[in-house]
Regions:
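A generic hydrophobic-helix recognition signal that picks specific residues
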Residues: 8, 191-192
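A generic secondary-structure signal for well-formed alpha-helical elements
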Residues: 12-15, 196
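Acidic, low-complexity Ser/Thr/Gly/Pro-rich repeat segments typical of extracellular/periplasmic
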Residues: 17-175, 179-182, 187-191, 205-209, ...
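Sec-dependent N-terminal signal peptides
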Residues: 4-13
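Coil residues (strongly favoring Ser/Thr
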Residues: 133, 233-234
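Conserved small/polar residues in nucleotide/adenosyl-binding loops
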Residues: 236-238
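Structured interaction patches on ligand/partner-binding surfaces of diverse proteins
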Residues: 116-119, 195-233
Length: 238
């Protein structure tokens, strides 16, 4: 009797271990989305505070490291803990009391089936009681699939922009539109590049400066900040 029970137990365990989607079944093509953050509203936070970010499905752990960033950049390494469909992010220590920061996940973030998020996800946080609300947006036109907009605080000359890491980064969406949200009311310098990354010298690739030396959000939000990048021709702004 014990031998029969042992055989039955082995069969049950084997069946449990072999559970999988049937051959030819539907393939998961649904991008992961942001579900919630805890705390829900990230105002009046404290340095090094833990923020739990939950997604709609399990993530691929290896994709997180190169897809998460905090803006404006302050050079501090981001600390986080992976928990399946959640990420615990430990906020940076050296924070400005009046600044609104952004945790951003770009489209390099993948679910466990290697499906990327559809567009960048931005999560604002601040030590203040309210977020900055200024915005800069526009389009990048050209014969390419996507591009990246680099934004610096202050009035920088072109040589400095090509040799300095930006404070903020935004990628264009499927409509070639970019948006910077939660900006302070101040002056900015901006540059559009076809490719940007830690191992890419964007100054040697295709890029375009905006026709105005400096942008200012002190009086209003800015839209129609447009660029044109062409692979074969010289680069111009609109």
């Amino acid at each position: 009797m014990s031998r029969i029970l042992l055989i039955i137990a082995i069969i049950i365990l084997n069946n449990c271990a072999s559970v999988r989607n049937p051959e030819g079944g539907p393939v998961d093509e649904i991008p992961p989305t942001l579900v919630s953050t805890n705390p829900q509203t990230l105002t009046s936070i404290t340095p090094k505070q833990k923020v739990t970010i939950r997604f709609s499905e399990y993530l691929k752990e290896s994709s997180i490291k190169n897809s998460i960033q905090v803006y404006p950049m302050n050079g501090e390494k981001i600390k986080y803990e992976f928990k399946g469909d959640k990420i615990d992010v430990m906020l940076p220590e050296n924070l400005n009391n009046e600044m609104t920061y952004i945790i951003m996940f770009d489209t390099g973030l993948l679910d466990e089936h290697s499906i990327p998020i559809k567009h960048d996800i931005s999560i604002p946080f601040t030590m203040s009681s309210e977020f900055d609300t200024s915005k800069i947006e526009g389009h990048v036109y050209g014969d390419f699939d996507n591009s990246t907009i680099l934004l610096w605080r202050g009035n920088l000359d072109r040589a400095t922009m090509l040799d300095t890491n930006p404070d903020y980064i935004a990628n264009t969406n499927d409509d070639n539109k970019f948006t910077f949200n939660y900006l302070p009311e101040e002056k900015f310098s901006v540059l559009a590049v076809q490719q940007y990354g830690s191992n890419i010298d964007y100054a040697k690739g295709q890029y375009a400066f905006y026709h105005e030396t400096t942008l200012s959000t002190k009086d209003k939000n800015l839209d129609k900040i447009n660029f044109f990048i062409h692979k074969a021709l010289s680069l111009i702004h609109i």
